[in-house]
Amino acid sequence: MKNLCIIPARGGSKRIPRKNIIDFLGKPLISYSIENALNSGIFDEVVLSSDDEEIIEVALKYGAKAPFVRDKNLSDDYASSTAVVQNAIEILQSQNQIYDHVCCLYATAPLLNKDILKQAYEKFIQNQSKFLFAATEFEYPIQRAFYLNENNQVYMFDEKHYKSRSQDLTKAYHDAGAFYFGTSKAWLEEDFIFKPHSSVFVLPRNLVCDIDTIQDLEFAKILYKVNHESAF
């Protein structure tokens, strides 16, 4: 079995300029994902998909490969991760590089470690599912969520759960925005990941942080320090 890790990292991040290579406790943010992928020992190649020369240079420094430059039409705010992964698989196939399994690992997942990737891969192989992705439990019961209408009035999505006890409600999970294992065939079929043909690797909340704002970035640094307390 040949395994490929693809790390998408475009250069045009808006809310945090140069997010993928911004300093994160002394190293570029993307370096954590590259090193974890390499040190996990499960990938034959760790490949960057980027349109940005500086990001490519940083990724090469930390051991990733960059055999192509991503097209600009796959580098805007509307390009999906699935399309980026498909593009990478197809380019590598045209270079006679064929892989059985492909992992999309986000550049913004510094809270992971190599052992998590190894355990997730083992579960993916054991389950024989099309996909396996990182998920985490919602902190609050989603059944008791509400919304505000145009007049800022409160409406529950489902009033029957107003008096329900939290422990009586079904647990709900969300995508952790960290990694996605899949067979090459499944990726190229462009099948929807959030279906019964997928399985999940549940992460504790202290390993999950969606880095979209400067506040998110600073919170991720705090989590990293807490998780690696002995190193600081």
Curated annotation (Swiss-Prot):
It catalyses: pseudaminate + CTP = CMP-pseudaminate + diphosphate. It is an enzyme of class 2 (transferase). Transmembrane segments: none annotated. Gene3D superfamilies: Spore Coat Polysaccharide Biosynthesis Protein SpsA, Chain A (3.90.550.10). It holds the Pfam family CTP_transf_3. Its EC number is 2.7.7.81. Keywords: Magnesium, Metal-binding, Nucleotidyltransferase, Transferase. Its cofactor is Mg(2+). One of its GO terms (molecular function) is metal ion binding. Belongs to the CMP-NeuNAc synthase family. Catalyzes the final step in the biosynthesis of pseudaminic acid, a sialic-acid-like sugar that is used to modify flagellin. Mediates the activation of pseudaminic acid with CMP by forming CMP-pseudaminic acid. This is Pseudaminic acid cytidylyltransferase. It comes from Campylobacter jejuni subsp. jejuni serotype O:2 (strain ATCC 700819 / NCTC 11168). The lineage of its organism: Bacteria, Pseudomonadati, Campylobacterota, Epsilonproteobacteria, Campylobacterales.
